């Protein structure tokens, strides 16, 4: 069983997640820790609980979701796992950050690429990669069928959807992917989004 711990980081209020199992192994999803105190909060939480990070996963590579990639990679010797189509977005992130007045040092090491249908395994727990572009060119989500949740990134929010006015965004595609990828999940599936409070598939379909 995977348990979800949530952090809200940076002036952009991005949700960073740690998924841990009973044995203490864990996955870090979308580390958006920008300030030093935020990075300490993340690492202190991990060390105080005795967790062992095994994966660094990015739903997509907009600046607010990768602020902490370099820190997490260096601290825990992890390689970011992304969709290959997000690589240009990752490379552009520092330039985008300057426009936001939030310069940062980007991760520049090796990458592991994930594709639709791939499985990320942590012991007996499994996350399935869902391909849901539209907010960004190659956005992916991570679905845990056994525990009934999906790490949705910036695809679907409570009472809202991801913005599509950023480079690589496509509104019609996002709407289609929400219908074809997200809304086919069970209604009780919990959605952990990149911003704001969690929701469920059923709630969003009704609203």
Region locations from a protein language model:
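Short acidic-hydrophobic surface loop/beta-edge motif
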Residues: 7, 19, 117-124
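Residue-level detector of beta-strand structural context in well-folded domains
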Residues: 17, 112, 117-118, 140, ...
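Metallo-beta-lactamase
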Residues: 33-34, 51, 96, 125-207
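Short catalytic-loop micro-motif centered on adjacent basic/acidic residues
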Residues: 28-30, 55-58, 129-131
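Residue-level marker for buried hydrophobic side chains located in beta-strands
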Residues: 27, 57, 80, 151, ...
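Active-site HxH/HxHxD metal-binding segment of metal-dependent hydrolases
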Residues: 33-121, 207
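Conserved beta-strand hairpin/beta-sheet module of binuclear metal-dependent hydrolase folds
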Residues: 1-49, 141-152
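Short Gly/Pro-enriched turn/cap motifs at secondary-structure boundaries
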Residues: 7-8, 109-112, 131-133
